[in-house]
Amino acid sequence: MREVWATNCFTGGGMGTDIRRVACVGAGLIGQDWATLFSSKGFEVVLQDLSETILEKSMKSVRSNLLFLEASHLLGRGGAEAALKKIRMNRFIGEAVCHADYVQESVPDDYDVKKTVYKEMDAMAPDHAILASSSSGLLMTEIQKVTKKPGRCVLAHPVLPVYLIPLVEIAGGEQTSQETLFAVRDFMKKLGKTPVVLKREVSGYIVNRLQAALLREAIDLVDKDVVSAEDVDKAFCMGIGLRDPMIGPFLRIHLAGEGVERFVENFSQSYRHRWKTMETWTSIPPLAAEKMVRSVREMEVVRKKTLEEIKNWRDQMLVKLLKIIRQG
């Protein structure tokens, strides 16, 4: 198989000093999004999956993503085709990672699956290569146990769509080196991402823990017939969702309380009453799940548009929002 690698590289210090070659292991939704991002930034990419059918489907999605970026003026004219030429497909993990400087793993979130893949990547990738996982909730301390070079293993969890949303959560396991954490942080900045490095591991990291808390309350409101799924989404999008692209929960309470200290003094009691009435279940009750599914299926946008149409509309709105935020 012909090896053609880009001259574009990221230069930092130590591990990850010269990232030219990127491998994406797992070609599902997350893997194809990463491939879109890496190729759009000029890196040569090997996109790997055991299934040739998944690879072919993934490449169609990558092409669509790149054409969208070009149409949105986030890639120059002809940029989509140029980026596509930088991607090769491969069904074998060993062949995909054997020349890589940076590997982004995006296989299913299951410890057994991750460990099997990491063991092979660790054996076949060059010693200097960083092995990053897209896991949305697993702990790297557990995954890296099967590797002989655990210091280079790290979590780099994106938010979909990866090629548009800037955030990347970075977390190390007990044996991950500081050098690896800093190298991934700097590489993500070079890609135009906004990295946040966790001080320590926690299941679900930041975004998914916040989303899990919000989703449980949303499901409970629908289950108790307080409101429909459509109106929950409306309240979010036209309320906190509209306000919070600029501020997070802590800056919000600082503003709402006219100082965070005053917020703690004046609002603690009202929040205590709310928290007392909130659900604490850790798995969705079957009847609540049925109600949620039925209510979501009744939403106007779900009834009238396909998943692909909703995704395209979402991405178009994200581009507009990002342009406004970046203009400051």
Regions found by a protein language model. Name each.
Residues 71-130:
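Rossmann-like NAD(P)-binding element
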